[in-house]
From Swiss-Prot:
Localization: Nucleus
Effect on the protein upon substituting residue 327 to D: In scc4m7; eliminates centromeric localization of SCC2 in mitotic cells and reduces association of the cohesin subunit SCC1 with the centromere and pericentromere
Name of the protein in question: MAU2 chromatid cohesion factor homolog
A cellular component term, taken from the record's GO annotations: SMC loading complex
Annotated transmembrane regions: none
Described purpose of this protein according to its UniProt entry: Involved in sister chromatid cohesion. Forms a complex with SCC2, which is required for the association of the cohesin complex with chromosomes. Binds to the nucleosome-free promoter regions of ribosomal protein genes and tRNA genes.
Recorded family membership: Belongs to the SCC4/mau-2 family.
Effect of residue 256 to K: In scc4m7; eliminates centromeric localization of SCC2 in mitotic cells and reduces association of the cohesin subunit SCC1 with the centromere and pericentromere
Additional detail: Present with 907 molecules/cell in log phase SD medium.
Gene: SCC4
Top-level lineage group: Eukaryota
Keyword terms, alphabetized: Cell cycle, Cell division, Chromosome partition, Mitosis, Nucleus
Amino acid sequence: MENLGDKLSISQVYHLAQEYRDHAYSIANKIGSEEGLKQYYGLMNMSIQMFQLLKTKCTLSVLEDSKVTFEMVELLIQETYNFDLAELYISSLKERLQTHQSDTDLVEEIMRCEFLLLHDLPLMRDSKFHYKIALRNCNELVQYMVNLQDELYQNWASVFQYVGVMLCIKLKQHRRVKTSFHGLLSQCREKSQWKWFLNLCYVNYLLNERFPIPEDALQELRSTELHTVGPELYAWKLALEMVIQLCKDGNITDHLNEFKNFFDTNKQSLVTNEGKGCVIKIMPRIALKVELPMIFHYKELKNILLLLQSVSYIVNCYDEKGNFSRKFLPKVYSTTQKLIKNIAAGGVSMNELDSRIQTYKSILEFCEFYKVWEQTLLKGAVVTTESPKLGPSPGYVRLLQAMKVQFEGGGAVEEYTRLAQSGGTSSEVKMISLLNCYTVQAARVSRCSGDKQGELVEQCNKVWLQVEKLLQETDLQFNPIWECTVTILWLFSHFEPFSWNPLPCSDKQRAEYVSKLREFYSSNKFVAGEAVADNRFKLKKALLLQILVNYLGGRMLEHDLGEIYAISAKCFDMCRQQGGMRKVQYVIGIWHLMNCTVAMRGKDVALTNAKLEALVKQITSVKQ
């Protein structure tokens, strides 16, 4: 490098720019006042000015210009949000690189410019307009590189096909995303880090959107090898498998043990590489550095696993032996608070620190929401909370508010309908909203007579079509709890004596739902000695559903009086295990009383009568 005047050399100015930046990073976690903010951004501006001085006052080689520009642009994008100026510098550098490409192999630098223009800048701008422009330019670049028929550019084309997929995800072009992922994966070498990385992205996308995951993607996920992808990506693989199992309401014990073994041998590597990014080798001359979310740092990952365990066991919160959610949720909350308190800069920007704090706050909000949900399961009513925010989006709070109105005797149909139609609402919140809305509407049909009945029936059918559509389009269809809930509600609303005015249906629908009930009943029958017909229909948790399945099965499928009596007795007794089920217990108690009477069990009749009278007193005293 040439000298910059008589005072400082170019290398000195360059190192000065780095010192200003690094010093700003070192004080980022200590900022607690406006003065501190001014100091931080003052240092960042000085760093940018030093880089600009190098570009405007010095004669830099192409590679030197690239190095300076890339470092300066990172600050412009991440610290000042001056995207237009960043784009100007990148475009100018790209033109210079293309002019000199005949003299030097500068493909990597040119591709980095393209990546910044087509990936980093559009994602930071985060607007549909910029995503569309970037996607069009990205497609043109890919086509250009493919037409060159050069192996090096063919490999770079796959990188920008990946960029195109990321842009399509942002534009919610879901059909195109799935097709593009399939095409990309089919082009990759088997058992390569690049292919397994793409598959991790694909499965992660499908889970995020709650789309069903194809078997070939699941098989690719299972085949991912630690020694090829490295500990960071393998931790991602394990986390995805855990979430998939949670979404299916499956047993997570094996996955927890796998994580334990993984931590035993890879803890140090995870800790050492925190914040350094993960380098994906595509070909010998091509690599892509990706930044994994903070939750894949060792301490954060262990905390997230505890949160996932809490969610997995939350429907068992009534069980004194298996109430892990009541033990783990407070622990996750306190651990997260400690992580916020002890957060350290570690050479990262203030924006990165803010991002980490927001992640921690999201975890705290999840904990708050699930604590309320847990109490709802235990008490059969939505409890009030002083927390200003529950869950990661307003939909969670609105759902609880609507449920509270419903529990207190109101309809809440309008709010449930709005929630189900909201664009940013999760699949679970939509499904709960639709099912609760259907329950309210079906209850109105049951009580209604006369002219309004036809209108209410039509409203019920419209809601049910949405329920079936959501179930078919998402991975909720693979969770037996959801399928069982849908089956039970349909049967309650279409058969006497559960409804005074059963909803009309076709013979095909009736046969389909009765067949599903038979499967769930065979797999979850309380009476000992019954073989499980199909593990897909086994309810591992969810006591209320188990009771209702046995209640419906006993009433609709059983014919032996002794069998019916045994089932009703067991259902009546099981209701006592979970709070908030007194009304369900009362209905089942009436059924059991009928069975005792028909079976001429005088002692049981008297005992059941006494229990029902005590139950009525408990229910009426709560109302008063």
